[in-house]
Amino acid sequence: EIASCLVGSEMCIRDRYILCLAILCVAIAAPTFAGEYQTGGDSILRTTKYGRKQLAITKILAAFTLFVVTFLVGITVHILILDAAFGTDCLKTSFQMRYSIINLPNINLGQLQIILAAAGLLSVLATVSCTLFLSAKFKDTLTVLLISIVVLFMPLFAYVAMGATWLSTILPSAGIGMQNNFLSQLANFNYLNIGGMSFWTPHVILISAGIELFVFTFLAIHSYCRHQVA
């Protein structure tokens, strides 16, 4: 009963918390480059010795540092508060006992907390990297923010409409949401097929987010360096 309460209530609250944190990070990241394009400050910074690639890398590293620290502090406080409220006696309970003995992950609820936090951080950073790329590509902060919000919620809408598909799992924010969150994917047997191979959706989500984190970061730097001042 305690385990059911923990997973059913605490994990649900954590999913919503990570989603809200992702929205906040996207809103903060949107004007990173686009804000300077709008004010014209970009044209001044580009004339300095380190005004292109080095500046882009510094801005991105500063943004990632801010978001990682914010996420880790927030999720740690969040876990401590919820564990204090629901109790820690059930953290050694098997994840398989809560859902089904045939669930693939052979972990306990304490390990599940760490896995969900790590997956949430990776998804948030991948989503932020996409926002940074859009910010380096477009000159209007509002446009960047609107597109980023659409990208953030697209996996949720895709999952509700079509279930577990490639569209609902390969986007940066695939592990963030309600029905499509990483916890629900761990608890289910959703597989995606390509050719003669099958891939478990949690693996697809993590691998895609990891690849997109590096790809979008590189594209953000490249786009900023190639941006032409009007």
Where are these regions (language model features)?
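Alpha-helical transmembrane segments of multi-pass membrane proteins
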Residues: K53-G74, H78, I115, A119
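Active-site loops and adjacent core secondary-structure elements that bind or stabilize anionic groups
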Residues: M11-C12
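Helix-loop-helix units of permease transmembrane domains in multi-pass membrane transporters
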Residues: T32-L66
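Hydrophobic/aromatic residues in alpha-helical transmembrane segments
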Residues: C25-A29, G41, C130, A220
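Terminal transmembrane helical anchor/hairpin motif
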Residues: G87-Q111, L142-L145, V151-H227
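A structural motif at transmembrane helix-loop-helix junctions in multipass membrane proteins
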Residues: Q113-L152
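Long, hydrophobic alpha-helical segments
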Residues: D15-G35
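Single conserved hydrophobic/aromatic residue that forms the stacking wall/gate
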Residues: E1-G8
